[in-house]
Design a protein with these regions (language model features):
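Alpha-helical subdomain
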Residues: 1-64, 69, 82, 171, ...
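Conserved Class I S-adenosyl-L-methionine-dependent methyltransferase catalytic core
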Residues: 10-25, 32-33, 47, 53-175
Length: 334
């Protein structure tokens, strides 16, 4: 076989069909349907609500690339080991990551406009991305699925160094904490479980706050946890001892980060404290650098850069904890 010409290699490298086919399969839940017995294009189309002829083309392409295998007649399909992580119940399931309609999947689509990020330094999705994800009812079901999946695993470990928030900060001085932008409440739940004297309030936008509240209600700390709908660009609940900002600022430009810190400063007052626990996303070369920058403005701020933002927001550092993957800084109004 002749060696491919350079232009052929380039077109192969730039091809979007196979990534799109895999993500369509994840979005349409086709792997789950195949496992449940819908193994022909007709049966899959009926189960998934898709067009039989296009579904057949998709299945044949998935077989060509090794995601599926077909029987001798080319009618019945089954998953290969490569395709099995597309199952929702696979131990290493990638379906949520690869779905076009998931938060992660939608964020990944920003790579299609990488030229915008290279030209401007800004992510393709700005604050409007988060507003859409957190307010669009279509995402409420996703948040609910994630919350129930987390609850189904006993002793769900915290990731990205978040465990140091629970174990390295001196929580004995606090009685109340507000988790600002606390997502589904994993960190707040861990805090309340490890420090039974604490009471916690989670603040986030509508979809995620409602799911976090339902998750708290199902937990053993229901009497000490609440979730309220709100934005960290608006006034926050006042009077708590500690305001936690975990993995928030990387998603925002410097001026927005200063605004967020300022809202925490105003709510904390002269006696309160802010615990900044920002993540510096690890990069393994230019590929991950480009991926992170296409989705967030500042994925890897150093501790010094974070401290400069805090100073601009009228805050001083009163304690320095771990740095690296997770930078921990306790802050107080200047």
């Amino acid at each position: 076989m002749a060696e491919p010409q350079p232009y052929e290699k380039l077109m192969s490298m730039a091809d979007l069909l196979t990534p799109a086919a895999i993500r369509a399969t994840a979005t349409l839940c086709l792997a789950d349907h195949i496992k449940a017995g819908a193994t022909t294009s007709e049966a899959l189309a009926e189960r998934a609500g898709t067009q039989p002829d296009v579904t057949d083309s998709l299945l044949r392409h998935l077989a060509d690339i090794g995601i599926l295998t077909a029987d001798d007649e080319g009618r019945h399909y089954s998953l290969t080991p490569i395709g099995e992580p597309l199952l929702s119940d696979h131990p290493f399931s990638l379906r949520q990551v690869l779905r076009n309609d998931s938060m992660i999947g939608r964020g990944t689509q920003s790579l299609l406009r990488l030229d915008h990020t290279v030209r401007t330094g800004e992510p393709t999705h700005g604050g409007g991305y988060w507003e859409s994800v957190n307010n669009d009812p279509a995402y409420a079901e996703e948040w609910g699925e994630q919350a129930r999946a987390f609850d189904a695993v006993a002793d769900q470990p915290l990731s990205w160094g978040a465990q140091y928030i629970v174990t390295e900060y001196d929580w004995s001085r606090a009685r109340s904490v507000v988790d600002v932008g606390g997502h589904l409440g994993a960190i707040l739940l861990a805090l309340l479980r490890h420090h039974p004297h604490l009471r916690g309030t989670l603040v986030d936008l509508k979809n995620v706050a409602e799911q976090a509240g339902a998750r708290f209600a199902r937990s053993e700390v229901a009497d000490r946890a609440e979730a309220v709908v709100g934005s960290f660009f608006d006034p926050l609940p006042k009077g708590a001892d500690v305001y936690l900002l975990s993995a928030i600022l990387a998603d925002w430009r410097d001026d927005d980060a200063v605004r967020i810190l300022g809202r925490c400063r105003d709510a904390a007052g002269p006696e309160g404290r802010i615990l900044l626990a920002d993540v510096a996303m690890p990069t393994n070369g230019p590929a991950t650098e480009l991926q992170f920058r296409s989705m967030m403005p500042a994925p890897s701020r150093s501790a010094e850069e974070l401290e400069a933002l805090c100073t601009e927001a009228g805050l001083k550092v009163t304690w320095r904890g771990r740095t690296g993957l997770r930078t921990l800084l306790e802050l107080a109004p200047r």
